[in-house]
Amino acid sequence: MSRHDKPATNVEATAGQGRHPPAVPRHSNPAVPRYSYYALAVLSLVNFLNYIDRQVLPAVANSMLNDPALKLTDADIGYMEASLLLSFTVLAPLFGRLGDRHPRAKLMASAAVIWSFATALTGLADRFSFMPSLNLHLPVINITLAISGVALALCAVRACVGVGESAYSTITPSLIADFFPPHRRATALGVFQAAIPMGFALGFVIGGVLAHFFGWRVAFMLVGVPGLLTAVLVWRLREPARGATETEAHASSLEEVAAAPAEAPRSPDSSGANESTLRTVWRILSTRDWLVSTAGYTALTAALGAFATWAIVVLVRDKGMDETSANITLGVITLLAGATGTFGGGWLADRVAARRHNAYFLVCAVSTLAGIVPTLGVLVADDARIYLPCTFLAVTLLFTSNAPFHAILLESVPVRVRAMAVALNIVIIHACGDAISRATVGVLSDSLKQGQFAALASFARAIGIDAGRQHLTTALLLAPAALAVSTTLFFVGARLQKRPRRAIEG
Protein backbone atom coordinates (compact mmCIF):
# COMPACT_ATOMS: atom_id res chain seq x y z
CA MET A 1 0.00 0.00 0.00
CA SER A 2 1.48 3.35 -0.93
CA ARG A 3 0.96 6.47 1.07
CA HIS A 4 -1.49 7.72 -1.58
CA ASP A 5 -3.73 4.68 -1.37
CA LYS A 6 -6.77 5.11 0.81
CA PRO A 7 -6.93 2.23 3.32
CA ALA A 8 -10.04 0.16 2.99
CA THR A 9 -12.42 0.39 5.90
CA ASN A 10 -13.82 -2.75 7.43
CA VAL A 11 -17.07 -2.24 5.53
CA GLU A 12 -15.34 -1.71 2.20
CA ALA A 13 -13.09 -4.70 2.72
CA THR A 14 -16.02 -7.04 3.25
CA ALA A 15 -18.52 -5.60 0.81
CA GLY A 16 -19.74 -8.14 -1.70
CA GLN A 17 -18.17 -11.03 0.20
CA GLY A 18 -21.01 -12.98 1.76
CA ARG A 19 -18.73 -15.09 3.89
CA HIS A 20 -17.52 -12.05 5.84
CA PRO A 21 -19.85 -10.12 8.14
CA PRO A 22 -19.94 -6.32 8.11
CA ALA A 23 -17.79 -4.41 10.57
CA VAL A 24 -19.16 -3.53 13.93
CA PRO A 25 -19.71 0.20 14.34
CA ARG A 26 -17.81 1.71 17.23
CA HIS A 27 -21.04 2.65 18.95
CA SER A 28 -22.13 -1.02 19.20
CA ASN A 29 -19.62 -1.55 22.04
CA PRO A 30 -19.45 -5.39 22.16
CA ALA A 31 -18.96 -6.95 25.61
CA VAL A 32 -15.46 -7.95 26.65
CA PRO A 33 -15.21 -11.54 27.97
CA ARG A 34 -13.63 -12.26 31.34
CA TYR A 35 -10.74 -14.17 29.83
CA SER A 36 -9.57 -10.98 28.13
CA TYR A 37 -9.23 -9.33 31.53
CA TYR A 38 -7.36 -12.36 32.89
CA ALA A 39 -4.96 -12.24 29.94
CA LEU A 40 -4.46 -8.51 30.45
CA ALA A 41 -3.67 -9.10 34.14
CA VAL A 42 -1.05 -11.75 33.32
CA LEU A 43 0.56 -9.69 30.57
CA SER A 44 0.63 -6.59 32.77
CA LEU A 45 2.16 -8.51 35.68
CA VAL A 46 5.03 -9.76 33.54
CA ASN A 47 5.49 -6.27 32.05
CA PHE A 48 5.68 -4.98 35.62
CA LEU A 49 8.49 -7.45 36.39
CA ASN A 50 10.14 -6.54 33.10
CA TYR A 51 10.55 -2.93 34.17
CA ILE A 52 11.67 -3.84 37.68
CA ASP A 53 14.50 -5.82 36.10
CA ARG A 54 15.33 -2.96 33.76
CA GLN A 55 15.33 -0.33 36.50
CA VAL A 56 17.57 -2.14 38.96
CA LEU A 57 20.70 -0.76 37.26
CA PRO A 58 19.72 2.92 37.71
CA ALA A 59 18.67 2.10 41.29
CA VAL A 60 22.11 0.72 42.19
CA ALA A 61 24.15 2.92 39.83
CA ASN A 62 25.45 5.10 42.65
CA SER A 63 26.64 2.00 44.55
CA MET A 64 28.36 0.69 41.44
CA LEU A 65 30.02 4.06 40.79
CA ASN A 66 31.37 4.03 44.36
CA ASP A 67 32.57 0.40 44.21
CA PRO A 68 36.41 0.59 44.09
CA ALA A 69 36.60 -2.83 42.45
CA LEU A 70 34.68 -1.60 39.40
CA LYS A 71 36.17 1.89 38.86
CA LEU A 72 33.22 2.94 36.70
CA THR A 73 32.58 6.42 35.28
CA ASP A 74 29.28 8.15 34.51
CA ALA A 75 29.88 7.31 30.86
CA ASP A 76 30.18 3.59 31.72
CA ILE A 77 26.72 3.58 33.30
CA GLY A 78 25.39 5.31 30.21
CA TYR A 79 27.00 2.70 27.96
CA MET A 80 25.40 -0.12 29.97
CA GLU A 81 21.97 1.41 29.57
CA ALA A 82 22.59 2.04 25.88
CA SER A 83 23.72 -1.55 25.29
CA LEU A 84 20.44 -2.91 26.65
CA LEU A 85 18.44 -0.55 24.48
CA LEU A 86 20.47 -1.15 21.34
CA SER A 87 20.02 -4.93 21.53
CA PHE A 88 16.38 -4.22 22.34
CA THR A 89 16.01 -2.20 19.14
CA VAL A 90 18.13 -4.25 16.75
CA LEU A 91 16.09 -7.39 17.38
CA ALA A 92 12.67 -5.73 17.55
CA PRO A 93 11.89 -6.11 13.81
CA LEU A 94 12.77 -9.82 13.95
CA PHE A 95 10.46 -10.39 16.90
CA GLY A 96 7.80 -8.23 15.26
CA ARG A 97 7.85 -10.45 12.20
CA LEU A 98 7.80 -13.60 14.32
CA GLY A 99 4.91 -12.18 16.32
CA ASP A 100 2.89 -11.60 13.15
CA ARG A 101 3.42 -15.21 12.02
CA HIS A 102 3.64 -17.44 15.10
CA PRO A 103 1.79 -17.99 18.41
CA ARG A 104 2.59 -14.95 20.47
CA ALA A 105 2.21 -16.33 24.01
CA LYS A 106 4.98 -18.88 23.51
CA LEU A 107 7.33 -16.24 22.14
CA MET A 108 6.62 -13.88 25.02
CA ALA A 109 7.12 -16.57 27.68
CA SER A 110 10.48 -17.48 26.18
CA ALA A 111 11.43 -13.80 26.22
CA ALA A 112 10.62 -13.52 29.93
CA VAL A 113 12.94 -16.43 30.70
CA ILE A 114 15.80 -14.84 28.73
CA TRP A 115 15.70 -11.41 30.34
CA SER A 116 15.15 -12.79 33.87
CA PHE A 117 18.15 -15.11 33.64
CA ALA A 118 20.33 -12.33 32.17
CA THR A 119 19.29 -9.95 34.96
CA ALA A 120 20.42 -12.45 37.58
CA LEU A 121 23.68 -12.98 35.70
CA THR A 122 24.42 -9.23 35.83
CA GLY A 123 25.37 -9.67 39.48
CA LEU A 124 28.28 -11.88 38.40
CA ALA A 125 29.35 -9.97 35.29
CA ASP A 126 32.23 -8.15 36.99
CA ARG A 127 33.97 -11.52 37.31
CA PHE A 128 34.70 -11.28 33.58
CA SER A 129 37.33 -8.55 33.98
CA PHE A 130 39.60 -10.29 31.46
CA MET A 131 37.65 -8.61 28.65
CA PRO A 132 39.65 -5.93 26.79
CA SER A 133 39.15 -2.20 27.31
CA LEU A 134 38.16 0.02 24.38
CA ASN A 135 39.03 3.62 23.47
CA LEU A 136 37.60 5.77 20.69
CA HIS A 137 38.61 9.40 20.11
CA LEU A 138 36.15 11.77 18.42
CA PRO A 139 38.29 14.63 17.06
CA VAL A 140 35.36 16.76 15.90
CA ILE A 141 34.15 17.35 19.46
CA ASN A 142 37.49 16.45 21.12
CA ILE A 143 36.08 13.65 23.31
CA THR A 144 37.57 10.22 23.98
CA LEU A 145 35.05 7.46 24.61
CA ALA A 146 36.69 4.87 26.89
CA ILE A 147 35.27 1.71 28.44
CA SER A 148 37.05 -0.75 30.74
CA GLY A 149 36.93 -4.54 30.49
CA VAL A 150 34.61 -4.80 33.51
CA ALA A 151 32.25 -2.21 32.05
CA LEU A 152 32.32 -4.03 28.71
CA ALA A 153 31.32 -7.30 30.42
CA LEU A 154 28.45 -5.54 32.17
CA CYS A 155 27.38 -4.07 28.83
CA ALA A 156 27.33 -7.54 27.26
CA VAL A 157 25.08 -8.98 29.96
CA ARG A 158 22.73 -5.99 29.85
CA ALA A 159 22.48 -6.48 26.11
CA CYS A 160 21.16 -9.99 26.79
CA VAL A 161 18.49 -8.48 29.04
CA GLY A 162 17.48 -6.33 26.08
CA VAL A 163 17.03 -9.40 23.86
CA GLY A 164 14.27 -10.81 26.06
CA GLU A 165 12.61 -7.47 26.72
CA SER A 166 12.57 -6.71 23.00
CA ALA A 167 10.52 -9.80 22.19
CA TYR A 168 8.01 -9.18 24.97
CA SER A 169 7.49 -5.46 24.40
CA THR A 170 7.21 -5.88 20.64
CA ILE A 171 4.60 -8.62 20.56
CA THR A 172 2.36 -7.95 23.57
CA PRO A 173 0.46 -4.83 22.34
CA SER A 174 -0.82 -6.67 19.26
CA LEU A 175 -2.15 -9.48 21.47
CA ILE A 176 -3.92 -7.01 23.74
CA ALA A 177 -5.47 -5.36 20.68
CA ASP A 178 -6.96 -8.75 19.75
CA PHE A 179 -8.40 -9.21 23.25
CA PHE A 180 -10.10 -5.79 23.46
CA PRO A 181 -12.42 -3.98 21.00
CA PRO A 182 -11.62 -0.41 19.90
CA HIS A 183 -13.86 1.26 22.48
CA ARG A 184 -11.91 -0.42 25.32
CA ARG A 185 -8.50 -0.66 23.68
CA ALA A 186 -6.89 2.55 24.92
CA THR A 187 -7.99 1.78 28.47
CA ALA A 188 -6.61 -1.77 28.24
CA LEU A 189 -3.34 -0.48 26.83
CA GLY A 190 -3.32 2.07 29.64
CA VAL A 191 -3.50 -0.75 32.20
CA PHE A 192 -0.67 -2.60 30.45
CA GLN A 193 1.44 0.55 30.10
CA ALA A 194 0.78 1.46 33.74
CA ALA A 195 3.02 -1.48 34.60
CA ILE A 196 5.91 0.63 33.28
CA PRO A 197 5.89 3.37 35.96
CA MET A 198 4.90 0.79 38.58
CA GLY A 199 7.84 -1.42 37.59
CA PHE A 200 10.12 1.60 37.48
CA ALA A 201 8.96 2.58 40.96
CA LEU A 202 9.42 -0.83 42.54
CA GLY A 203 12.71 -1.20 40.68
CA PHE A 204 13.99 1.86 42.51
CA VAL A 205 12.69 0.71 45.89
CA ILE A 206 13.62 -2.97 45.63
CA GLY A 207 16.97 -2.34 43.99
CA GLY A 208 17.90 0.39 46.46
CA VAL A 209 16.88 -1.58 49.56
CA LEU A 210 18.56 -4.81 48.41
CA ALA A 211 21.74 -2.92 47.50
CA HIS A 212 21.76 -1.23 50.90
CA PHE A 213 21.49 -4.48 52.87
CA PHE A 214 23.14 -7.04 50.58
CA GLY A 215 25.08 -5.13 47.93
CA TRP A 216 24.37 -4.42 44.28
CA ARG A 217 25.33 -7.93 43.10
CA VAL A 218 22.68 -9.69 45.20
CA ALA A 219 20.11 -7.11 44.09
CA PHE A 220 20.50 -8.21 40.47
CA MET A 221 20.41 -11.91 41.35
CA LEU A 222 17.21 -11.74 43.39
CA VAL A 223 15.08 -9.60 41.10
CA GLY A 224 15.55 -11.99 38.19
CA VAL A 225 13.75 -14.88 39.93
CA PRO A 226 10.05 -13.77 39.72
CA GLY A 227 10.21 -13.38 35.94
CA LEU A 228 11.24 -17.01 35.57
CA LEU A 229 8.20 -18.12 37.59
CA THR A 230 5.58 -15.96 35.88
CA ALA A 231 6.74 -16.96 32.41
CA VAL A 232 4.70 -20.16 32.93
CA LEU A 233 1.48 -18.13 33.12
CA VAL A 234 2.24 -16.44 29.81
CA TRP A 235 3.09 -19.76 28.16
CA ARG A 236 -0.38 -21.10 29.06
CA LEU A 237 -2.35 -18.16 27.64
CA ARG A 238 -4.78 -18.99 24.84
CA GLU A 239 -4.80 -16.56 21.94
CA PRO A 240 -7.71 -15.05 20.03
CA ALA A 241 -7.70 -14.92 16.25
CA ARG A 242 -5.77 -11.97 14.86
CA GLY A 243 -8.12 -9.05 14.41
CA ALA A 244 -10.59 -10.81 16.71
CA THR A 245 -12.13 -7.59 18.01
CA GLU A 246 -12.48 -5.79 14.68
CA THR A 247 -15.60 -7.56 13.33
CA GLU A 248 -18.86 -8.75 14.82
CA ALA A 249 -18.09 -12.40 14.13
CA HIS A 250 -14.68 -12.11 15.68
CA ALA A 251 -16.05 -10.22 18.68
CA SER A 252 -18.45 -13.06 19.42
CA SER A 253 -15.85 -15.74 18.81
CA LEU A 254 -13.55 -14.02 21.30
CA GLU A 255 -15.90 -15.18 24.05
CA GLU A 256 -14.91 -18.76 23.25
CA VAL A 257 -11.17 -18.14 23.62
CA ALA A 258 -10.96 -19.51 27.16
CA ALA A 259 -12.05 -22.92 25.90
CA ALA A 260 -10.13 -22.82 22.64
CA PRO A 261 -6.64 -24.13 21.94
CA ALA A 262 -3.81 -21.67 21.45
CA GLU A 263 -3.62 -20.11 18.01
CA ALA A 264 -1.79 -22.29 15.52
CA PRO A 265 0.83 -20.85 13.19
CA ARG A 266 -0.75 -19.38 10.07
CA SER A 267 -0.05 -20.89 6.72
CA PRO A 268 2.20 -18.95 4.35
CA ASP A 269 -0.71 -18.05 2.09
CA SER A 270 -2.84 -16.46 4.81
CA SER A 271 -3.63 -12.78 4.62
CA GLY A 272 -0.53 -10.64 4.88
CA ALA A 273 1.82 -13.54 5.59
CA ASN A 274 3.20 -13.66 2.04
CA GLU A 275 4.04 -9.96 2.02
CA SER A 276 7.78 -9.33 2.03
CA THR A 277 9.33 -7.81 5.11
CA LEU A 278 10.58 -4.77 3.17
CA ARG A 279 7.11 -4.14 1.74
CA THR A 280 5.62 -4.43 5.22
CA VAL A 281 8.17 -1.99 6.60
CA TRP A 282 7.50 0.49 3.79
CA ARG A 283 3.76 0.12 4.32
CA ILE A 284 4.18 1.13 7.96
CA LEU A 285 6.72 3.91 7.38
CA SER A 286 4.45 5.49 4.75
CA THR A 287 1.59 5.78 7.26
CA ARG A 288 1.58 9.43 8.31
CA ASP A 289 -0.07 9.08 11.73
CA TRP A 290 2.30 6.27 12.68
CA LEU A 291 5.36 8.22 11.53
CA VAL A 292 4.52 11.53 13.22
CA SER A 293 3.44 9.92 16.50
CA THR A 294 6.60 7.80 16.57
CA ALA A 295 8.78 10.87 15.98
CA GLY A 296 7.07 12.71 18.84
CA TYR A 297 7.38 9.77 21.18
CA THR A 298 11.05 9.35 20.29
CA ALA A 299 11.84 12.79 21.68
CA LEU A 300 9.69 12.11 24.75
CA THR A 301 11.47 8.79 25.29
CA ALA A 302 14.84 10.54 25.11
CA ALA A 303 13.82 12.80 28.00
CA LEU A 304 12.25 10.05 30.10
CA GLY A 305 15.14 7.66 29.53
CA ALA A 306 17.73 10.19 30.61
CA PHE A 307 15.90 10.82 33.88
CA ALA A 308 15.21 7.11 34.44
CA THR A 309 18.93 6.36 34.36
CA TRP A 310 20.31 9.36 36.21
CA ALA A 311 17.62 10.50 38.68
CA ILE A 312 18.99 8.58 41.68
CA VAL A 313 22.57 9.70 41.06
CA VAL A 314 21.39 13.32 40.75
CA LEU A 315 19.39 13.12 43.99
CA VAL A 316 22.38 11.67 45.87
CA ARG A 317 25.29 13.53 44.29
CA ASP A 318 23.77 16.91 43.39
CA LYS A 319 20.79 17.24 45.77
CA GLY A 320 22.38 15.70 48.88
CA MET A 321 19.95 12.83 49.64
CA ASP A 322 21.20 9.48 50.91
CA GLU A 323 20.91 6.60 48.43
CA THR A 324 18.25 4.51 50.19
CA SER A 325 16.00 7.52 50.82
CA ALA A 326 16.43 8.65 47.22
CA ASN A 327 15.39 5.23 45.88
CA ILE A 328 12.36 4.94 48.15
CA THR A 329 11.25 8.53 47.55
CA LEU A 330 11.61 8.35 43.79
CA GLY A 331 9.99 4.91 43.79
CA VAL A 332 6.89 6.16 45.59
CA ILE A 333 6.65 9.23 43.36
CA THR A 334 7.05 7.18 40.19
CA LEU A 335 4.48 4.62 41.34
CA LEU A 336 1.78 7.14 42.24
CA ALA A 337 2.44 9.73 39.56
CA GLY A 338 3.24 7.29 36.77
CA ALA A 339 0.16 5.16 37.37
CA THR A 340 -2.00 8.28 37.66
CA GLY A 341 -0.68 9.67 34.40
CA THR A 342 -0.93 6.41 32.48
CA PHE A 343 -4.40 5.40 33.68
CA GLY A 344 -5.60 8.98 33.43
CA GLY A 345 -4.20 9.39 29.93
CA GLY A 346 -6.04 6.31 28.65
CA TRP A 347 -9.28 7.31 30.37
CA LEU A 348 -9.07 10.91 29.16
CA ALA A 349 -8.15 9.96 25.58
CA ASP A 350 -11.06 7.52 25.22
CA ARG A 351 -13.52 10.18 26.37
CA VAL A 352 -12.13 13.06 24.35
CA ALA A 353 -12.09 10.73 21.32
CA ALA A 354 -15.89 10.65 21.41
CA ARG A 355 -15.83 14.34 20.43
CA ARG A 356 -12.57 14.86 18.55
CA HIS A 357 -11.03 12.57 15.95
CA ASN A 358 -7.51 13.81 16.81
CA ALA A 359 -7.96 13.43 20.57
CA TYR A 360 -5.07 11.02 21.04
CA PHE A 361 -2.57 13.41 19.45
CA LEU A 362 -3.97 16.36 21.42
CA VAL A 363 -3.71 14.57 24.77
CA CYS A 364 -0.08 13.69 23.99
CA ALA A 365 0.75 17.24 22.89
CA VAL A 366 -0.87 19.13 25.76
CA SER A 367 0.43 16.83 28.51
CA THR A 368 4.00 16.92 27.16
CA LEU A 369 3.92 20.71 26.85
CA ALA A 370 2.68 21.03 30.42
CA GLY A 371 5.47 18.73 31.62
CA ILE A 372 8.32 21.01 30.51
CA VAL A 373 8.06 23.52 33.38
CA PRO A 374 8.12 21.00 36.27
CA THR A 375 10.97 19.16 34.53
CA LEU A 376 13.03 22.35 34.63
CA GLY A 377 11.97 22.82 38.24
CA VAL A 378 13.45 19.43 39.16
CA LEU A 379 16.82 20.46 37.71
CA VAL A 380 17.02 24.02 38.99
CA ALA A 381 15.68 23.66 42.55
CA ASP A 382 17.90 22.53 45.43
CA ASP A 383 15.09 22.56 48.01
CA ALA A 384 13.31 19.19 48.37
CA ARG A 385 10.05 21.06 49.03
CA ILE A 386 10.27 22.26 45.44
CA TYR A 387 12.02 19.56 43.40
CA LEU A 388 10.04 16.61 44.83
CA PRO A 389 6.58 18.06 44.01
CA CYS A 390 7.96 19.07 40.61
CA THR A 391 9.08 15.49 40.10
CA PHE A 392 5.60 14.19 40.90
CA LEU A 393 3.94 16.64 38.52
CA ALA A 394 6.43 16.01 35.72
CA VAL A 395 6.08 12.22 35.92
CA THR A 396 2.28 12.45 35.93
CA LEU A 397 2.15 14.68 32.87
CA LEU A 398 4.81 12.87 30.85
CA PHE A 399 3.26 9.43 31.41
CA THR A 400 -0.14 10.74 30.32
CA SER A 401 0.94 10.21 26.70
CA ASN A 402 1.56 6.49 27.15
CA ALA A 403 -1.86 4.99 26.40
CA PRO A 404 -3.05 7.45 23.70
CA PHE A 405 0.24 7.15 21.86
CA HIS A 406 0.02 3.35 21.73
CA ALA A 407 -3.59 3.60 20.59
CA ILE A 408 -2.47 5.79 17.66
CA LEU A 409 0.28 3.30 16.91
CA LEU A 410 -2.07 0.31 16.69
CA GLU A 411 -5.04 1.97 15.00
CA SER A 412 -3.02 3.61 12.23
CA VAL A 413 -1.81 0.35 10.64
CA PRO A 414 -3.42 -2.83 9.28
CA VAL A 415 -4.30 -5.50 11.82
CA ARG A 416 -1.94 -8.08 10.31
CA VAL A 417 1.16 -5.91 10.73
CA ARG A 418 0.57 -4.51 14.21
CA ALA A 419 3.41 -6.45 15.83
CA MET A 420 5.80 -5.24 13.13
CA ALA A 421 4.53 -1.67 13.60
CA VAL A 422 5.29 -1.90 17.31
CA ALA A 423 8.70 -3.40 16.52
CA LEU A 424 9.64 -0.57 14.16
CA ASN A 425 8.44 1.92 16.72
CA ILE A 426 10.67 0.31 19.35
CA VAL A 427 13.65 0.51 17.00
CA ILE A 428 13.15 4.20 16.35
CA ILE A 429 12.22 5.48 19.82
CA HIS A 430 15.13 3.70 21.48
CA ALA A 431 17.85 3.85 18.81
CA CYS A 432 17.12 7.54 18.16
CA GLY A 433 15.83 8.36 21.64
CA ASP A 434 16.91 7.07 25.03
CA ALA A 435 19.75 4.82 23.87
CA ILE A 436 21.42 8.05 22.78
CA SER A 437 20.24 10.29 25.61
CA ARG A 438 21.24 7.97 28.47
CA ALA A 439 24.79 7.56 27.16
CA THR A 440 25.07 11.20 26.05
CA VAL A 441 24.21 12.50 29.52
CA GLY A 442 26.92 10.30 31.04
CA VAL A 443 29.53 11.44 28.53
CA LEU A 444 28.49 15.09 28.93
CA SER A 445 28.71 14.80 32.71
CA ASP A 446 32.28 13.49 32.56
CA SER A 447 33.20 16.15 29.98
CA LEU A 448 31.70 19.00 32.03
CA LYS A 449 33.66 17.76 35.03
CA GLN A 450 36.82 18.19 32.93
CA GLY A 451 35.87 21.76 31.96
CA GLN A 452 34.51 21.10 28.46
CA PHE A 453 31.28 22.46 26.91
CA ALA A 454 31.63 25.93 28.41
CA ALA A 455 28.54 27.26 26.59
CA LEU A 456 26.28 24.66 28.20
CA ALA A 457 27.84 25.36 31.60
CA SER A 458 27.24 29.10 31.16
CA PHE A 459 23.58 28.52 30.28
CA ALA A 460 23.16 26.30 33.33
CA ARG A 461 24.59 29.01 35.59
CA ALA A 462 22.25 31.56 34.03
CA ILE A 463 19.17 29.58 35.12
CA GLY A 464 20.49 28.83 38.61
CA ILE A 465 22.39 25.53 38.29
CA ASP A 466 25.88 25.29 39.80
CA ALA A 467 27.50 23.82 36.69
CA GLY A 468 30.89 23.48 38.36
CA ARG A 469 29.51 21.15 41.04
CA GLN A 470 26.31 19.83 39.46
CA HIS A 471 27.73 18.64 36.16
CA LEU A 472 25.26 15.73 35.90
CA THR A 473 22.30 18.06 36.46
CA THR A 474 23.71 20.36 33.79
CA ALA A 475 23.96 17.47 31.33
CA LEU A 476 20.29 16.62 32.01
CA LEU A 477 19.22 19.96 30.50
CA LEU A 478 18.98 17.90 27.31
CA ALA A 479 15.68 16.53 28.67
CA PRO A 480 13.49 19.68 28.57
CA ALA A 481 14.89 20.46 25.12
CA ALA A 482 13.75 17.02 23.94
CA LEU A 483 10.30 17.62 25.46
CA ALA A 484 9.92 20.82 23.44
CA VAL A 485 10.62 18.87 20.25
CA SER A 486 8.13 16.18 21.28
CA THR A 487 5.39 18.72 21.96
CA THR A 488 5.85 20.30 18.53
CA LEU A 489 5.60 16.96 16.73
CA PHE A 490 2.46 15.87 18.60
CA PHE A 491 0.74 19.16 17.74
CA VAL A 492 1.75 18.62 14.10
CA GLY A 493 0.16 15.17 14.25
CA ALA A 494 -3.07 16.60 15.66
CA ARG A 495 -3.15 19.21 12.92
CA LEU A 496 -2.55 16.69 10.12
CA GLN A 497 -5.00 14.04 11.31
CA LYS A 498 -8.02 15.00 9.22
CA ARG A 499 -10.04 11.81 8.89
CA PRO A 500 -11.62 9.81 11.73
CA ARG A 501 -9.53 7.04 13.25
CA ARG A 502 -10.54 3.50 12.32
CA ALA A 503 -9.18 0.03 12.57
CA ILE A 504 -7.60 -1.08 9.31
CA GLU A 505 -7.91 -4.64 8.07
CA GLY A 506 -4.95 -6.10 6.31
Annotate the PLM regions.
Residues 29-32, 246-294, 318:
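Juxtamembrane intracellular "pre-TM" segments in multi-pass secondary transporters
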Residues 81-97, 332-345:
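Central cavity-lining transmembrane alpha-helices of secondary-active solute carriers
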Residues 155-198:
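Cytoplasmic helix-loop-helix junction between adjacent transmembrane helices
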